[in-house]
Amino acid sequence: MKVIYDQVADILTIILTEAPVAESDEDKPGVILDYDDKGNLVSLEILDASRRVNIPSKIEYQVSPIGG
């Protein structure tokens, strides 16, 4: 998984897999979901991220323990 914040474009992108994007869908205004040719989620983009996410340039990543 990769998280990218483009400060110039103000877009937060979360890439779940490196599969090629076959289709994109704007789920809600400013939230774009990208899918591969099998319908699996590849990535999501949040447009105007600084208005939607507190401090988009500061990302915290946490893995929950198995079974917890």
Model-derived features: positions:
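Small, basic N-terminal interaction modules of short regulatory proteins
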Residues: 1-68
